Amino acid sequence: MAERSAPVGVMDSGVGGLSVLAEIQRLLPNETLLYVADCGHIPYGEKSPDYIRERCRHIAEFFHEQGAKAMVLACNTATVAAVADLRELYPTWPLVGMEPAVKPAAAATRSGVVGVLATTGTLQSAKFAALLDRFANDVQVITQPCPGLVELIETGDLASPALRQMLQGYVQPLLAAGCDTLILGCTHYPFLRPLLAGMVPNDVAIIDTGAAVARQLRRLLGANDLLAKGPAGAARFWTSADPEALRKILPVLWHKSDDVQSFAL
């Protein structure tokens, strides 16, 4: 049995999961967090499910070696491809995945039209289709795949004209179709909230699932008597790409400067 003081592993294809990591640290400040950014293999959204599963297995094994008591897949595409596989491999390990916020969006919409920004992999998945079938029968859902958006966010330049232009091109058709609720279906996209605020009317609700994932992690840790006690926990970072690149982005997206180690698998 893992100890309460053991860390929690959090992974993403890149820096997008930092939006989830921030929610976890806000809700569970005593937890020690391990974050792996698989930047050397980004973007997951354009990779095959088998490729993504293999990456997630490597990272899960690394977290186990580090003594992690739980794992968070802070990536919608990774969850779609790998969460069932990982739960089979590690049946006693608390595992939390991501899914687009279809249920709260369907409840929130007034116009009956919901827009979804997500990766191609997420939107084409059976898991996403099942979410729509379960929660969105009474609303119109318009999906917008966003190739290239993750890569621009990974640069850390959230004010670049190229990023603004690309995002505008993805959002405008959804607004034109009457969307009053917008789902951010990728953990990278919450970093675009300031840009989106200038593109969409004030009455358009923007929904993501970072806070819900943090609450689910708290529930699972509590159910397994694994919630950390005592002093505030720290966060440690690894990347499968150049560590210096992540070091430069952390102050922008994480708002802190931390050391970054190389993850070689």
From Swiss-Prot:
Pathway: Cell wall biogenesis; peptidoglycan biosynthesis. It comes from the Bacteria. GO terms for molecular function: glutamate racemase activity. Provides the (R)-glutamate required for cell wall biosynthesis. SUPFAM superfamilies: Aspartate/glutamate racemase (SSF53681). It holds the Pfam family Asp_Glu_race. The active site is at 75 (proton donor/acceptor), 186 (proton donor/acceptor). Substrate binds at residues 12-13, 44-45, 76-77, 187-188. PANTHER family: GLUTAMATE RACEMASE. Gene3D superfamilies: 3.40.50.1860. Belongs to the aspartate/glutamate racemases family. It comes from Pseudomonas putida (strain ATCC 700007 / DSM 6899 / JCM 31910 / BCRC 17059 / LMG 24140 / F1). Keywords: Cell shape, Cell wall biogenesis/degradation, Isomerase, Peptidoglycan synthesis. Its EC number is 5.1.1.3. This is Glutamate racemase. It catalyses: L-glutamate = D-glutamate. InterPro entries: Asp/Glu/hydantoin_racemase (IPR015942), Asp/Glu_race (IPR001920), Asp/Glu_racemase_AS_1 (IPR018187), Asp/Glu_racemase_AS_2 (IPR033134), Glu_race (IPR004391). GO terms for biological process: cell wall organization; peptidoglycan biosynthetic process; regulation of cell shape.
